[in-house]
């Protein structure tokens, strides 16, 4: 919208700015998928924030350090900024590894987004589906995940969140989660579009 474009136009610190304005409103999905694929086509490392994510200033340094440290470690798929426990007790380091993640502020590499299956073709492969069902059961992951992927494919839209999770599951990917939460989500209220309290 016009307000968002004005914010970008008013950036006053030294940096290179790239614009990718859609001529048509596609809605959240597939717009987020399209924007992320575009951003990762320009850079091999990116930090992704949605319009309602408010990061702590330390989030950027946290991402920069870990993007560099784990750049060539293919076990790591993403760096999360959100920790839903706010503070994770009994962990002495600044972060820990997990098999799931939140999309409320994250960073990753092109090598990861290159693995994304925009068309959900894994749904047509019996061996992939057997593995996916086993992973969902073993890791106690969302029981409705396969159903969500099927619905997203039926809608003909690339929903990056399910695509990203499927990619992590199939590639045994890990996320890095900060011991202390670094993201406040202004859209996480009872009357929000994508959030139910």
What is each model feature region?
Residues 1-48, 53-197:
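An acidic/histidine-cluster motif and surrounding catalytic segment
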């Amino acid at each position: 919208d016009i307000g968002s474009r004005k914010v970008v136009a008013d950036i006053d610190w030294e940096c290179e700015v790239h614009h990718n304005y859609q001529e048509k409103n596609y809605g959240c999905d597939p717009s987020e998928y399209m924007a992320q694929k575009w951003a990762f086509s320009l850079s091999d490392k990116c930090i992704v924030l949605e319009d309602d994510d408010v990061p702590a200033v330390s989030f950027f340094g946290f991402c920069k350090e870990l993007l560099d440290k784990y750049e060539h470690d293919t076990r790591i798929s993403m760096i999360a900024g959100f920790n839903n426990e706010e503070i994770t007790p009994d962990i002495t380091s600044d972060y820990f590894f997990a098999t799931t993640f939140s999309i409320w502020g994250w960073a990753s590499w092109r090598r990861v987004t290159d693995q994304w299956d925009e068309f959900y073709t894994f749904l047509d492969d019996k061996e992939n589906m057997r593995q996916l069902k086993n992973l969902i059961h073993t890791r106690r992951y969302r029981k409705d995940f396969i159903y969500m992927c099927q619905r997203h494919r039926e809608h003909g839209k690339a929903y990056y969140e399910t695509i990203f999770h499927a990619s992590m599951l199939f590639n045994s990917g890990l996320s890095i989660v900060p011991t202390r939460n670094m993201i406040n989500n202004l859209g996480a209220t009872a009357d929000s579009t994508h959030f139910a309290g």
